[in-house]
Amino acid sequence: MADRVDWLQSQSGVCKVGVYSPGDNQHQDWKMDTSTDPVRVLSWLRKDLEKSTAGFQDSRFKPGESSFVEEVAYPVDQRKGFCVDYYNTTNKGSPGRLHFEMSHKENPSQGLISHVGNGGSIDEVSFYANRLTNLVIAMARKEINEKIHGAENKCVHQSLYMGDEPTPHKSLSTVASELVNETVTACSKNISSDKAPGSGDRASGSSQAPGLRYTSTLKIKESTKEGKCPDDKPGTKKSFFYKEVFESRNAGDAKEGGRSLPGDQKLFRTSPDNRPDDFSNSISQGIMTYANSVVSDMMVSIMKTLKIQVKDTTIATILLKKVLMKHAKEVVSDLIDSFMKNLHGVTGSLMTDTDFVSAVKRSFFSHGSQKATDIMDAMLGKLYNVMFAKKFPENIRRARDKSESYSLISTKSRAGDPKLSNLNFAMKSESKLKENLFSTCKLEKEKTCAETLGEHIIKEGLHMWHKSQQKSPGLERAAKLGNAPQEVSFECPDPCEANPPHQPQPPENFANFMCDSDSWAKDLIVSALLLIQYHLAQGGKMDAQSFLEAAASTNFPTNKPPPPSPVVQDECKLKSPPHKICDQEQTEKKDLMSVIFNFIRNLLSETIFKSSRNCESNVHEQNTQEEEIHPCERPKTPCERPITPPAPKFCEDEEATGGALSGLTKMVANQLDNCMNGQMVEHLMDSVMKLCLIIAKSCDSPLSELGEEKCGDASRPNSAFPDNLYECLPVKGTGTAEALLQNAYLTIHNELRGLSGQPPEGCEIPKVIVSNHNLADTVQNKQLQAVLQWVAASELNVPILYFAGDDEGIQEKLLQLSATAVEKGRSVGEVLQSVLRYEKERQLDEAVGNVTRLQLLDWLMANL
């Protein structure tokens, strides 16, 4: 059944309810399965009803809203859920029968609580983990500031940028500062509505550019390490620190270190005491520092992936030569190492608890990953605009479109390295550069779906033909083609069918034409396309005769060629032979094209527009000609076939005519025998069959409607198959495609109706059995669950729903209710609307303190 079900407006009739009592000799093999449609539908229905009772009357189920898992939990109580049990009953001499059980159980109330600390809930663990993470980040930030602003460090580069003041001179450092500032500002605006827990007011404050200053600092620290031996020279280690920090001008007027910055501008630093939330300030500044460090680490691999040779003064020069290439990985490694050490010092004994450590790491890396990913996305966009958004010179512009894809992948964590645990960032940026000399040309009219599909299939057919082209001697092909049309005789001519022309044709001219094999592929598919497009343009409302006459007047006439699509015209021009084609060859080509056209026209007429006269007079001939036709639809006017099965002479005649290829199909196949290989013919015929489905799907009498009209009510449990089911199906034994269609239709019919054919002797029809193991639940919930199961089974066209294992009289009441509903002709939508009214009345009574007198089943018996 469809995924979208309008339960409240459903007109499906309700099913009957029975009591299931298993026999003594039935073995029950219980198995768990969670991929059942009835349970999924029941979970959707449950959620929709709960939304409706809560006041969301306009809510409807959307696909993807709930993913079905082993247990579908209640939104109100997390301890309850649905589950499904399957069991197979196997008897000797009979196939196994599949039964399923829908159960409602309770889980222990402490099943989902983590054993952390003194038994606190998982929310408390998350709260304290976030607080400790903020503290660790603040301590790491303090450590970084001490390293960067220490007296032993040598400042290599420092720049300052203010949002509301004019930019300084355009130096290399200024370009870097502008880029980073704009990137972080854009990132702050984008993520202001999606802040991580505990992020405070950094995101909202950073979106106001005039109130912010941004500082980028690059310092170097040299440390001397003595050698193990006295004669060894002391080793020198250089560490670079790159810091980028937001600073607010409204927090104070203190100078940094008592010194003025370049350009007579003052750097204001915010004191933690002036902030309302110290943890928000810590996590904001700490994550910004961490994210910028991670961005530096990412840009190393990005530049290596791009393999860019930069020779100008863009931002890539600074990122490549001064900051990123050598020192970003060390900064990130030191930062994470510092985090872990400080975390161990702060938490103490809690670090021995693996669950607590995992929670802290997950919280920390989720925050850091989100911020770093947002900043990375903005920086990549800006970097691409600087490096690639340039106008190409005229000498490299091409007539065709250019498409370049750059995959930007960051470094990932090394295996077995605890410092880089869970550190895995990836970013992809794809861009397409389209340069076309003919971009100023007038835009063509938008093509329809049929035209687009036709051109695509034409291109694919020609492409396959070029790969599989095998040339044969022209005389042999011509002889084969000249003799083929005479093999077919029409016993009962029909005005809708046109016989192929029989004209003497010189073999040598045929050889010249047949060498141009592309025209065969093109003409075969274009013929069907033009017919289909014309039919779609008319809306599929014209009769068979007028359709074929109009198609014949617009396709392959004797005085002018057909109007193919523009793509086909271009291909014909490119593939025309260089020598001049004589008039005789043109005439022969038109004759051959008319052969193909007549075949397509007869194909469509036999597939779609068979009239009653054709069915009565040409049953023998058309039955042999339908084997290659895809039997998707039947005629607009139902054919009057006899109720009895057809005589076996059809199958014998089919074998006599050559098996799968017969009639016009065999004629054309013989014509194309030596012109194309068998695989190419198969591809072309398959393409034409698929195109014919377009007309078939647009007809007014689909197979399902014919099945319902002719087969009657197939939902009756008394008859597994209606007697006249085969009236609306293809005859057995008339072809592989029709046999597959017949089997598919019967399978779908059985699945929708809950039947599987006439059961063998001694076997029972499969039963849908429901067993609810919710002993601790209330009677009200049990009754509501039983009603919902009954409604879901009715929507799935289950004839009888059996309940097993009831001790509180619910089965007896539900039996009476179902009998009453079936007698009154109630639908699924009416039952659900009554359930909603009862739930509203019950909630109103509980709100004012009244006690509901009637249970759900009793109320439905009185008011349904």
Swiss-Prot record:
Phosphotyrosine: residues bearing it: Y406
Region: PKA-RII subunit binding domain, residue numbers: 125-138
Region (Disordered) location: 190-235, 251-281, 619-638
GO MF, any single term: protein kinase A binding
InterPro entries, per database record: AKAP_110, AKAP_110_C, SPHK1-interactor_AKAP_110
Recorded superkingdom: Eukaryota
Location relative to the cell: Cytoplasmic vesicle, Secretory vesicle, Acrosome; Cell projection, Cilium, Flagellum
Regions of compositional bias (Polar residues) in chain numbering: 204-218
Signal sequence region: none
Gene Ontology biological process terms in this record: blastocyst hatching; cell surface receptor protein serine/threonine kinase signaling pathway; establishment of protein localization; flagellated sperm motility; protein localization
Keywords associated with the record: Cell projection, Cilium, Cytoplasmic vesicle, Flagellum, Phosphoprotein
Outcome of gene disruption: Male mice are sterile due to sperm morphology abnormalities. The absence of Akap3 affects the integrity of sperm structure, causing mislocalizations of sperm proteins.
Coarse class of the protein's main subcellular location: cytoplasm
Known partners and oligomeric status: Interacts with ROPN1 and ROPN1L. Interacts with QRICH2.
Domain text: RII-binding site, predicted to form an amphipathic helix, could participate in protein-protein interactions with a complementary surface on the R-subunit dimer.
Family note: Belongs to the AKAP110 family.
Protein name, UniProt field: A-kinase anchor protein 3
Protein species of origin: Mus musculus
Gene this chain is encoded by: Akap3
